[in-house]
């Protein structure tokens, strides 16, 4: 027998394959305050017990592999392994479970969303023993949160920078999203800001294409911002999309935006990646820029109920990585978003502390300690008739963005902006007077339209426009 063989035998190594549940299913385990907790929606293959499936998820997303390895004896599995500590059947489903997994904090690099996701939502999602797997929620411990900077500035600092309080902020995505020259693009920005909007926005796929290079767009938009500010006396901004093919190019664009003196830049955080996003967030805090986040590609990840990752997890990840705004659906517009679920992750973005709330799909109590909040952005297929519902659903700490609902106005861009500003001010005043926006919303808009011809014209154009399709992702309680 060789010395190597003798060493393996002396530590009790036994080659072969054993059930995951023997090592990674630990129902007696009490999670530590420092553990990262995950709630997975697990759909096992037929014949795979729920305990084995949950344990497999814990193993393959932490220290485990498909067979016993002798190097297990060179470390402490009890210290580093993930543990499936609780399993609940999903109501209304025959073979689907919520499996709760606890991960020791030492498994993750400090301040790195990239590393956290590489482990928790890595290769395990292609595991053959599972028909489907979805990460529903994470509990991020305070000890890990404190290793992140988080949003560059947060809600209160943004309001102070803009000197705007007591109402949602108003925005607009410039349309058509692709094809305009930089000068015509800047003209549209100016008209919308002059009409009463707080922000205008690059669409997510506006980067630096042949028809409009980024530097030209930045210059014309900055000119539009300063001209609109001079005419209105209000602070204005345009989300200049700094997303680029490399991190170096992205930062170069952000540097140029800062040199122009504009207040805010933008990033597509999922297509750009968490490493790039965190780098940009650090630059924005150091240089006084607000950071608007678009979630392009999110529905590829989060829309299917049984597989992928819920947006509430992506929202938590963004708050760690850094962003002052993030798109969060509208509930009433053209994009997917069930009301209770949307309000659940809106709370996660804005509040310092959220409790477990099954009615909103929140699986864990979450403390954000001193991490600044993020403004949710409602955007996508909304117009003036939606204003009462949006004001009631999202409240003051939000951004309401009307792209087609501004630039589609029959009289032009500036009247479209006027219509939205009048509608918003009317809804905020009515709410402050104690009126019920949900019940009286249409009446409030009609009353305001009597003295605003711009709003009256908008009401006429969009009076029949609705997007009434059932949400794909709904709460499990709906099946009971």
UniProtKB/Swiss-Prot annotation:
Keyword Oxidoreductase appears in the UniProt entry: yes
Keyword Transport attributed: no
Amino-acid positions noted as binding substrate in the UniProt annotation, renumbered to this chain: 123, 173, 177, 295, 327, 379
Naturally occurring in which organism (per UniProt): Mollugo verticillata
Name of the protein this chain belongs to: Ribulose bisphosphate carboxylase large chain
Cellular location(s): Plastid, Chloroplast
Gene3D superfamilies documented for this protein: Ribulose bisphosphate carboxylase, large subunit, C-terminal domain, RuBisCO large subunit, N-terminal domain
Further remarks about this protein from its record: The basic functional RuBisCO is composed of a large chain homodimer in a 'head-to-tail' conformation. In form I RuBisCO this homodimer is arranged in a barrel-like tetramer with the small subunits forming a tetrameric 'cap' on each end of the 'barrel'.
GO MF term (any one): magnesium ion binding
Family membership: Belongs to the RuBisCO large chain family. Type I subfamily.
UniProt KW keywords: Acetylation, Calvin cycle, Carbon dioxide fixation, Chloroplast, Disulfide bond, Lyase, Magnesium, Metal-binding, Methylation, Monooxygenase, Oxidoreductase, Photorespiration, Photosynthesis, Plastid
Function: RuBisCO catalyzes two reactions: the carboxylation of D-ribulose 1,5-bisphosphate, the primary event in carbon dioxide fixation, as well as the oxidative fragmentation of the pentose substrate in the photorespiration process. Both reactions occur simultaneously and in competition at the same active site.
């Amino acid at each position: 027998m060789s010395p190597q063989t003798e060493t393996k035998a002396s530590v009790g190594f036994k080659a072969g394959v054993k059930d995951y549940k023997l090592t990674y299913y630990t129902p007696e385990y009490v999670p530590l305050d420092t553990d990262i907790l995950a709630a997975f929606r697990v759909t096992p293959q037929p014949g795979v017990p729920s305990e084995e499936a949950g344990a497999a998820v814990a193993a393959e997303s932490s220290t485990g592999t498909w067979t016993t390895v002798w190097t297990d004896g060179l470390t402490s599995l009890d210290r580093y392994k993930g543990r499936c500590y609780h399993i609940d059947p999903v109501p209304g489903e025959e073979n689907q479970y919520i499996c709760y997994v606890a991960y020791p904090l030492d498994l993750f690099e400090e301040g790195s969303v990239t590393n956290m996701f590489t482990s928790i939502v890595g290769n395990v999602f292609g595991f053959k023993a599972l028909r489907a797997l979805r990460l529903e929620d994470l509990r991020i411990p305070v000890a890990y949160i404190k290793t992140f900077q988080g949003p560059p500035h947060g809600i209160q600092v943004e309001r102070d920078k803009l000197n705007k309080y007591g109402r949602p902020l108003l925005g607009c995505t410039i349309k058509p999203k692709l094809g305009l020259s930089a000068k015509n693009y800047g003209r549209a920005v100016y008209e919308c800001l002059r009409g009463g909007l707080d922000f205008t926005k690059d669409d997510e796929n506006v980067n630096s294409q042949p028809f409009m290079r980024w530097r030209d767009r930045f210059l014309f938009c900055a000119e539009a911002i300063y001209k609109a500010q001079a005419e209105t006396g209000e602070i204005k901004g345009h989300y200049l999309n700094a997303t680029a093919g490399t991190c170096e190019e992205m930062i170069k664009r952000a540097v140029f935006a800062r040199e122009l003196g504009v207040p805010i830049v933008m990033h597509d955080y999922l297509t750009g990646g968490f490493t790039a996003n965190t780098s940009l967030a650090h630059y924005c805090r150091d240089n006084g820029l607000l950071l608007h986040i678009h979630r392009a590609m999110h529905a590829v990840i989060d829309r299917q109920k049984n597989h992928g990752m819920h947006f509430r997890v992506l929202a938590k990840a963004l708050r760690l990585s850094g962003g002052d705004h993030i798109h969060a659906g509208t509930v009433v517009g053209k994009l997917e978003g069930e009301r209770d679920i949307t309000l659940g992750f809106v709370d996660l973005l804005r509040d310092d502390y959220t409790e477990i709330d099954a009615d909103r799909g929140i699986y864990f109590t979450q403390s954000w300690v001193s991490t600044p909040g993020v403004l949710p952005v409602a955007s996508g297929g909304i117009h003036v008739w939606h204003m009462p519902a949006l004001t009631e659903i999202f409240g003051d700490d939000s951004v309401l963005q009307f792209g087609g609902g501004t630039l589609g106005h029959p009289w032009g861009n500036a009247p479209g902006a006027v219509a939205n500003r009048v509608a918003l001010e009317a809804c905020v005043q009515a709410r402050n007077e104690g009126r019920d926006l949900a019940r009286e919303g249409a009446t409030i808009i009609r009353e305001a339209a009597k003295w605003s011809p711009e709003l009256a014209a908008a009401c006429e154009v969009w009076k029949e426009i609705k997007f009434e399709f059932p949400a794909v992702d709904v709460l499990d309680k709906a099946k009971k």
